[in-house]
Amino acid sequence: MTTPALFTPFTLKDVTLRNRIAVPPMCQYSAVDGFTTDWHLSHYAGLARGGAGLVIVEATAVSPEGRISPGDTGLWNDEQAVGMARIAEAIKADGAVPGIQIAHAGRKASANRPWEGDDHIAEDDPRGWETISPSAVPFGANLNKMPKAMTQADIDRVQADFVAAAIRARDAGFQWLELHFAHGYLAQSFFSVHGNTRADGYGGNAANRGRFLLETLAAVREVWPANLPLTARFGVIEYDGRDEETLAEAIELTRAMREGGLDMLNVSVGFSTPNAQIPWGSAFLAPVSERVRREAGLPVASSWGIDDPVAANRVVEDGQMDLVMVGRAMLANPHWPYQTAMKLGLERPSWVLPAPYAHWLERYRVQSA
């Protein structure tokens, strides 16, 4: 039988994934001073053991001020890289490619964990810190803390932090690096008209608003191995009433990032305004991803609402995505790849899992036939 598209290998640079199922970064908010814990080790090993081809470690802050919450992981010192190296090795040992996303939360930083309010930490709470952003414009809604407008020195420092974190990720054994340029965090805020009111070379027209992203990419490209994938998650659309304009600008910037050494784009939503009218639904970003793939000329991945096996296979088969990012479905069922393989009729579906699981599942199936 023909192998379903979702279960065909995917090669980018010198890295080959066993299938097109990827686990996107999903913050666990369970770190201590940026350090990973046993929770992270078991969590990521379990996702890899479930059969995904790529497992990307959650948004990992490049500096203490870059954390979303006090529970975020970090790579701003060498000691934090020790725990990350254990995670990378565990993911690899269970058959997946270890990836990591490095990030700065910008004006959305200094927040309580989602289950503790999901709002900014109170000004008089010692757990909080000053936030920075391209401009002194708060996000709004539950995140209304006024950020400090960044100076050139701030920009230079943050970009140096990205470089240092990328080096630590490389040395920790990660084979796939994703830059977080999405979701209303710092880089997205530079690109977005909702977060950037600057009048200098980093603001105004789309080219200027994309400058921080291009400079950060170029700086990281210098230190990240040329044979390993360098990717970015980028909000190419906001659903704010100027969708066509934003998407056209985002595609133009994506072309520039591709020319600057970007290997793949993880297509997402901007989340730069609380007033967005997002059309939530199954694989709702698939047409957007397809357009980015076609017009920007590079491989794409995407997530959001892709939990149905048939839909996941179809977006790959139809050329809308090269990889499918499966998030919440993998949290609910880390063996989602196995159940998907069965539903799609993959021959010997048990063997998408490691042998210690697969032989029992296949043996039981044969005996009960």
Residue ranges: model-predicted function:
Residues M1-A369:
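Flavin-dependent oxidoreductase catalytic cores
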